[in-house]
Amino acid sequence: MDETINSIAEYRLIPEYLEKISEEGKIWLARAMVSILIVDKQLVNEEKGFFKDAIMMIENDEIRGELIESIKKREIVELGELTTDREYAGHFYFLLAMVVAADGKVKNSEVNLLNSICGKLGFPAETSKQILNWVTNLVKLNKERDNITESLKDIKPVFVLK
């Protein structure tokens, strides 16, 4: 997928909602995001906004540095269990699935990491299957959206006068 103006329609973290998440929850989420971004050993343009989101939500410079280094080295960050912010755990998982879908492909390494993260979130294994089904559909819908918006560029306007 080429980098285009489609970025105006991408999903991002909303700063006002981040204020409700504990620092521990933000660190966990940022580490999970970075791990998903690099598990396939590449960082494409469509994923860079998520990397920025992950870095910017962290106030601790040492942890920010750890995340930046892990991207540079393409090494997954150690991720423990999410014990705080349980009310947001489902939202975190869907956000991580959107990170997987950002480049328009779902790779085996990403599937394996999402399965692992499911356990770290304390969810039953079938939750991972539901999320993977959803992310597969999201990738298909994003491709369909891209095809439609591409075809709409070539349509000459037809205005109906009243």
Model-derived regions: residue spans:
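Small-residue-enriched hydrophobic alpha-helices in membranes
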Residues: 1-162
